[in-house]
């Protein structure tokens, strides 16, 4: 007998050699029916996995993130089975689960039409009704290649696997797919499925490879859950910054400018300017000094920093190393430049910490499949910064950085919408990370200890660190349910040594400083996208590009309308007047659609009494009030940065 420690701490004795599913059955038939996968000794495993020793075990149902992934992963295989039934000539690529659903990539003669998606969805339902058993089996490499010989993408995936790696397959009826799992025991639990859309996607995300047809879908154990999700999806579409941002005149794109290069229109530029001025003032108030550094540098700088070895594919390189005496690259980050500034003068321990901040224009060579609106772009503006400090100052400086981030998130009204992720290295991925296991473990332990001291509730993620050190990622879930990293705080153990950075300690000795890479608000473009979605375009008054709109009832009151505009502008309010010869009702409706916080109607009575008739986004029609009172009110609201 072996001892199984369950999630609630209870211990169950079972025979060795049982599968996770059989252990679930021994606990409860209901639990077994709803089981999607298991977490065995901290690792997600298939329900078919055999347990031979004392272990900790959590049975995951659809209510857990791990369970949802196994559930949707199974649904992706049902989709692939449906495609092979209806379109046997199409070739299989990959079909993972993703947040809130799944996708599968196929090599097709032409993209799937809406009618074909409907037929595939019906075929999936037919397969689910047949309820074939899902079987898992393993094969040696030569037999696996023979089995998949007619599926070129699967052959490539098998050849990519390292020697000795387990090569496993899952079979649904007569459909077989290469897959590591985990999967459900059967397809019957999938009670509701919906194919959402078909798009193009490059094989392995590489633009040099063939464009495949990617089909997105979602699946649930109850139809009511699918209905609720689809309803939420419709609401999300209304809030999507890519749609709203264009409708509200915040940004646009142009195919001649290029993908991933959004054009901020006057309203968008005003919003960014407002946020930028606020952040720069706040950073200076907290002891940061501003820098202004070049947009590019010689490859030599990036070779010292390690970006050339670990990040070159993500950079825009100008020139050819084999032909040109000097090769430059547009900067993907600011750190090497601020290190050069630090090294330009000598520093005593009394000078530390040094806190550099810069509003940096950065460039990253994102692939076309990764770019989205303002969230993933090729040129962006980052509130970047680096703190150079002694080991004794590290925890306080990290805490102060977290305090700044929390203040920014609270002021933006999104503090309750963020989560924290402690991102660590993967010791097996030496191409991505500086290969210094001792330094990694030491720095990760330091960061974990600091996070625990700060009582930060965080999750941990492997293989998500920067190449030079672990990081705390501040995550925000967008309207489509996908988590985006909006801010990172990183502890760097490597670059101070690479750049020869030092300070003189109290004994006159040279010592290596610690470096904290940080941002206060993240990438301004991504933050703007997040705010548009959070507020459905109705940005708080202090952020809104147009804070008040003055509407004269007719041309007779144009002079007074202009007088109101001038007084508001004099007090720093962003205001416009609408002098078009349109009916007042039409102009009010349009101003409301533009999410204008305050609409001020002026006519004969208002002009005579020096008043404005106020309609606020928050309270609706408020009636007439003295102009001076309204000006003081909106100025105070803006100054307090009310949400």
UniProtKB/Swiss-Prot annotation:
Recorded GO CC terms: cytoplasm
Domain TGS: 1-61
EC number in record: 6.1.1.3
UniProt-annotated stretches for the region Catalytic: 240-540
Keyword Ligase in record: yes
Cofactor(s) required, per the database record: Zn(2+)
Stored NCBIfam families: thrS
Subunit and partners: Homodimer.
Name this polypeptide is given: Threonine--tRNA ligase
């Amino acid at each position: 007998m072996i001892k199984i420690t369950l999630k609630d701490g209870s211990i169950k004795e079972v025979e060795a050699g049982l599968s996770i599913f059989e252990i679930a059955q021994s606990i409860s038939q209901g639990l077994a029916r709803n089981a999607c996968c298991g977490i065995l000794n901290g690792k997600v495993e298939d329900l078919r996995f055999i347990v031979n020793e004392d272990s900790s075990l959590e049975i995951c149902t659809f209510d857990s993130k791990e369970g949802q992934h196994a559930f949707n992963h199974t649904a992706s295989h049902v989709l692939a089975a449906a495609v092979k039934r209806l379109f046997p000539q199409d070739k299989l690529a990959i079909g993972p689960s993703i947040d809130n659903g799944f996708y599968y990539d196929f090599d097709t003669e032409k993209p799937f039409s809406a009618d074909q998606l409907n037929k595939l969805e019906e075929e999936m339902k037919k397969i689910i009704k047949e309820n074939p058993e899902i079987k898992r089996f393993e094969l040696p490499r030569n037999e696996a290649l023979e089995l998949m010989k007619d599926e070129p993408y699967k052959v490539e995936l098998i050849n990519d696997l390292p020697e000795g790696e387990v090569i496993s397959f899952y079979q649904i009826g007569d459909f077989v797919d290469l897959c590591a799992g985990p999967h459900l025991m059967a397809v019957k639990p999938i009670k509701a499925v919906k194919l959402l859309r078909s798009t193009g996607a490059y094989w392995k995300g590489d633009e040099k490879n063939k464009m495949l047809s990617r089909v997105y879908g979602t699946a649930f154990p109850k139809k009511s859950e699918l209905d609720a999700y689809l309803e939420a999806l419709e609401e999300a579409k209304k809030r999507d910054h890519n749609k709203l941002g264009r409708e509200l005149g915040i940004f646009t794109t142009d195919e001649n400018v290029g993908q991933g290069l959004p054009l901020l229109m006057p309203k968008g530029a005003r919003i960014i300017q407002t946020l930028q001025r606020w952040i720069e003032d706040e950073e200076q108030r907290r002891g940061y000094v501003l820098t202004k550094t070049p947009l590019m540098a010689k490859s030599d700088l990036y070779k010292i920093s390690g970006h050339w070895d670990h990040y070159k594919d993500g950079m825009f390189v100008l020139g050819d190393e084999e032909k040109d005496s000097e090769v430059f690259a547009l900067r993907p980050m600011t750190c090497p430049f601020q290190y050069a500034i630090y090294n330009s003068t000598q520093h005593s321990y009394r000078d530390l910490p040094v806190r550099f901040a810069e509003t940096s224009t950065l460039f990253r060579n994102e692939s076309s499949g990764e770019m989205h609106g303002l969230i993933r772009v090729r040129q962006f503006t980052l509130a970047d910064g680096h703190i150079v400090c002694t080991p004794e100052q590290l925890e306080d400086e990290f805490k102060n950085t977290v305090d700044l981030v929390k203040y920014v998130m609270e002021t933006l009204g999104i503090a309750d919408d963020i989560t924290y992720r402690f991102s660590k290295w993967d010791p097996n991925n030496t191409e991505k990370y500086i290969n210094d296991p001792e330094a990694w473990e030491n720095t990760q332990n330091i960061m974990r200890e600091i996070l625990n001291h700060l009582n930060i509730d965080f999750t941990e993620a492997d293989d998500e660190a920067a190449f030079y050190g672990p990081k705390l990622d501040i995550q925000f879930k967008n309207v489509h349910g996908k988590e985006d990293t909006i801010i990172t705080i990183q502890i760097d153990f490597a670059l101070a040594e690479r750049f020869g950075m030092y300070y003189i300690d109290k004994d006159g000795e040279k010592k290596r400083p610690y470096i904290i890479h940080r941002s206060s608000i993240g990438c301004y473009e991504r933050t703007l996208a997040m705010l548009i979605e959070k507020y459905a375009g109705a940005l708080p008054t202090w952020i809104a590009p147009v804070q008040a709109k003055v509407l004269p009832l007719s041309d007779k009151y144009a002079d007074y309308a202009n007088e109101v505009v001038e007084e508001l502008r004099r007090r720093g309010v962003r205001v416009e007047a609408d002098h078009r010869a349109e009916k007042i009702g039409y102009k009010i409706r349009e101003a409301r659609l533009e999410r204008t916080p305050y609409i001020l109607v002026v006519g004969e009575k208002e002009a005579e009494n020096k008043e404005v008739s106020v309609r606020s986004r928050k309270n609706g029609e408020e009636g007439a009030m003295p102009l001076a009172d309204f000006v003081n009110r909106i100025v105070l609201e803006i100054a307090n940065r009310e949400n």
